[in-house]
Amino acid sequence: ISATPVTPNATESAIKLYSFLRENFGKKTISGMMTGDMSGYTMGADFKTHDDVKYTYTRTGKYPALVGLDFLFASGPKANESWNKEYTDKAISIAKGLWKAGGIPAFTWHWKDPLDKKDAFYIQSAANGGEYTDFDFSTGFKPGTTEWNTESAAYKGIVADIDHIADYFLELQKEGVAGIFRPLHEAGGKWFWWSINSGEQFAALYRLVYDRMVKVKGVKNMIWVYNPEGSTVTSWDPGSEYYDVLSIDIYNSANDHSSNASAFDKFKNASKSTKIIALSENGPIPDVNNMHTDEAVWSWWMPWYSTWSGTWPGQTKDGVWKSNMNDERIITLEDMPGWDKYTAIIKPDTSTTSIATMPRMAGTATTVGIFDMNGHYLGITTQGLPQGHYVVRRKIQGNIVNTVYFKK
């Protein structure tokens, strides 16, 4: 598993978050909870007052370390209506408060019709008689290829929506907040418009989301997730350089707390053990004892919400909730170290490393970070550090350069 996230020049916060996920993967599992209804949450209030977050505390006496948030109302023909905008603003408010408290925001995007013709993301066969979209993103390609036709209406609509969501991430980035982003989720499932075409076409769409956000908009604070159905894990893969985490959504029957080891092993093998593996949506939680017995220790789990009449968190037995949230192998919010205190463990990129003695440092405004020789992040200045060798990471004319200095 890579020591650094796939995003080039990731923010310090993103590096810390990725390092935390990597450090604990296979040893401990991060507890999560999805949010749904925002009507009971007051803008700017403590995220712990959200009904879905409170649910976990009421059942267990502990808060989840990871909280799921959705851009469900951030795009589509009604995105600019006050209620919809308020929903998204509340989600961003929760993300900020959660990060400040040492937690992890995890974003999903139920992406509505990019042409804004329908306020829907489901295709007709999955809409259960409700509103659906017939948007076909393949109309954004040049005929017979997966090369984008930048003059097409489909491409322009897709890019406009991507840019809009990217702006929310950039707002968080300015405040030092990082998060997890799971775009185009449940890839290969025949219910969302982004999965109606081929795996090759899906992969091109995923790469467009990543490239537009990271390389054009400058989003550097997200940990990226590829979330396919089990049958499409390899055939729809956008490329390992586009995601940090491989995840699956599994909804067992109520009170079924099995580890889902077969899915874990399938995804681990598909990634050749090079990716963090997560259970990004679930009903009942996998019992921690089962996970460790079966050697299927998910990076995190996240039951879907209890609000909006959601029944999923209630599908976990009371005793299992309590025993798991009080087990040292499950990470709750109370167990989180605090991002200001956490030291990232990364391996310096020696391909751009030069050797020099430590002079009086100039241009400190360009310094990205100081690391010890084992890759531990130490801060942005060598002041107060003892004599020895350090890796100084600097941004020079837009490029990141690592230099090994000896401080006398």
Where are these regions (language model features)?
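Aromatic-lined carbohydrate-recognition surfaces of secreted/lumenal glycan-active proteins
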Residues: 32-34, 182-184, 188, 206-233, ...
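Alpha-helical scaffolding within the catalytic cores
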Residues: 16, 47-56, 89-93, 164-168, ...
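Glycoside hydrolase catalytic-domain groove-lining segments
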Residues: 231-290, 313-350
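N-terminal module-boundary/linker segments of secreted carbohydrate-active enzymes
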Residues: 1-88, 96, 288-291, 327-350, ...
